[in-house]
């Protein structure tokens, strides 16, 4: 659109690159979407009280959301390739905003599954980590790890801003009013994306940020022919490489131990220990603050250090934190210690995982390959969202779920060493990088 071109020209005259506007818009988009994903975790008890649904029932609807959220990843990449970033993201934000708004009028359980399971799952899946991977690869030739770190940290920022506000609104004005800020944020961002988002740097006459001077500005055209079968073809190729299975397996555990368990059940878990929703949401916000720092730092580190070592540290630290949580006694001190150590690596696993996927499978395929890896992440989240709710219903405690997730994270830390050191990964064609 002319608005984006004019802004790009104005920035260029001042020595600024339009790619950072794309980063800002993507950051706010992911922030709004993540707020929509995180808010239902604060509404388990209010929904249970109003409609008589138990934790297991509500968790099953949220599990549908996580599953669709992840399964959209590979197809989000192809949709962005075929229809453009802007069109896909506008549709996605419209779905999320509509799902949030319609949920305020629900009266039946299937309404919850449709609005917060299907609509929220599909919409948020189109604006998930795959969007960050595509933006960083298309718009940047340098600082990709940092950009992925910044964009990934948006989910922590959304939690930091919206969860305490949402919990306060639930207590004072009811759960329906808690939905309003998230709906407004998604609606506003849909307009902003329509005005500012562009598909590639060449759309505004630019090279990717960091491209060498003299590099030709390439015409905006897909790098490879894509069809609906392309994600499955990419999956078949990636599945022959053990790096894919290690990254998918560890990311399954990542989703299981974060979105599915802590994001969904932490406020309910604290309620079992006698902690109200507002203090519990404040602890989640504290985790978000530490995660904001940890994820951006992880992006910076992933550009400079062995990403296997980073993932080993992140998964190990997370596993120990989860194993310790039941013994924290849920005091202010205990929860603060947990929030710090768990929060620092909540989503810090993403930049190293994206870097390893890109180094192994190449720039053009990295988006779709990471889409499948992210699908594993969200399937893990779905398993934990339902499984932890089931455990809570049957045993009246979340402790077995915490112990299982902690042990799984330690397993993920060990699995990382199956990957060979990618010393010259960027220079080795994907077919040669294939594991024996």
Show the residue positions of the predicted features.
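Extracytoplasmic
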Residues: 18-55, 73, 261-267
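Hydrophobic core of transmembrane alpha-helices in multi-pass small-molecule transporters
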Residues: 31, 99, 111-126, 252, ...
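Extracytoplasmic gate region of multi-pass secondary transporters
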Residues: 40-44, 236-295, 384
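Interfacial helix-cap and linker-helix signal at transmembrane-aqueous boundaries
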Residues: 47-48, 79-80, 161, 165-173, ...
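Conserved MFS/SLC helix-loop-helix module at the cytosolic interface between two early adjacent transmembrane helices
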Residues: 71-110, 302, 308
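Cytoplasmic helix-loop-helix junction between adjacent transmembrane helices
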Residues: 116-153
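Helix-loop-helix hairpin linking two adjacent transmembrane segments in secondary transporters
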Residues: 154-204
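C-terminal transmembrane helical hairpin of 12-TM major facilitator-type secondary transporters
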Residues: 279, 285-291, 297, 302-356
